[in-house]
Amino acid sequence: MISRIDLRGDALPEGPALRDLLPRADFDVSVALEKVRPICEAVHHRGDAALIDFTEQFDGVRLERVRVPAEELTRALEGLDPEVRAALEESIRRARLVHREQRRATHTTQVVPGGSVTEKWVPVERVGLYVPGGRSVYPSSVVMNVVPAQEAGVGSIALASPAQAEFGGIPHPTILAACALLGVDEVYAAGGATAVAMFAYGTESCPPANMVTGPGNIWVAAAKRFFTGKIGIDAEAGPTEIAVLADSTADPVHVASDLISQAEHDPLAAAVLVTDSAELADAVEKELQPQVEATKHIEDRIRPALAGRQSAIVLVDGLDEGLRVVDAYGAEHLEIQTADAAAVADRVKNAGAIFVGPWAPVSLGDYAAGSNHVLPTGGCACHSSGLSVQSFLRGIHIVDYTRDALAEVARHVVTLAEAEDLPAHGAAIKARFEWKVPESK
């Protein structure tokens, strides 16, 4: 059901050579990019009409309008199962606790007497948040996108999720109910690349956004790449992935269930166990089969995900080697199920989020840990972070110098300008001192 990669016995290679030994899904955004280009251009030129046509083509329903009426959000909240509502409210409460602490304060550094640099943080003015709606329904992604944007102080928040033919062309009612709980009333029935293009270009119904965030499939990732440099994006999110670093103290039942929990997202989802215990590897592999048979989404998601080239049990000589492997892999979700798990977690350099010990499974983070589940995938955790309040903030430096403070450093500025053959830079300093630049101290 799941392959093995044995890295024991030989010294592990460095850098790219080690990454090449590790399992990864085929996820070529460049191929999808050429297919989304005409979709994005059509939305640019035809606006809502293109959105309506593409929704009929891809989602099988003809819309009368793209924006969801406010009464649909009210109706969805009124019809929400009380237990689901309570769970969403608790998820929102915990997410707010964590994300509120991420706010950044204005800070001033006095460089010299009379010369200061202040860094202030300003929220993006308008964001477009995307919540997928293909294989599953993700009200939790509404929470994970909206809460950090709100806590950052974003003034205008719009959200898009695919139209559902089953519900007459509106997004899934649970998505709408989550929006209502969070006070988001600008919601659009738009999915995939069309939603990203709508936010990027704007249409008759939807003003353009400064930034687009949220998870999605390869078409969403391709559209984000298409608009890189034109609008802000969070990341090109690919298929979800879990890596578990475990030793002989780990419970194979827990490990197997956690691997399966992420495999049920998508047939391209990655599930990777890294361990120095052959006995644990055997026990986990034995445990996978009965757990898979006892759940849903077996043939269309879980089995192909576990059997795919992106999933494996990786055997290593010891914990140090295991840490090197998980750092090279850079998992979206990394569980540490070892002795002294907190100390081991502290040694990890590359992961979207780390889940410490047997009582912090990835599922907790997906819904109600307080952390964010919009995380870098495909090894991007080596250089990128998950969605947070900072994602929606821009740092602006405010430079404030008096005449004396400028005079003190003027000679250095002119010298560097001349060294770079940019005499007008130096002239801008000289002009303030009647072409007589005082000696820098």
From Swiss-Prot:
PROSITE patterns tied to this protein: HISOL_DEHYDROGENASE
Binding annotation for Zn(2+): 262, 265, 366, 425
UniProt source species: Streptomyces coelicolor (strain ATCC BAA-471 / A3(2) / M145)
Function: Catalyzes the sequential NAD-dependent oxidations of L-histidinol to L-histidinaldehyde and then to L-histidine.
Pfam families found in the cross-reference section: Histidinol_dh
UniProt protein name: Histidinol dehydrogenase
Enzyme class, first EC level, given as a word: oxidoreductase
Coiled coil regions, renumbered to chain: none
Residues that hold substrate according to the record: 240, 262, 265, 333, 366, 420, 425
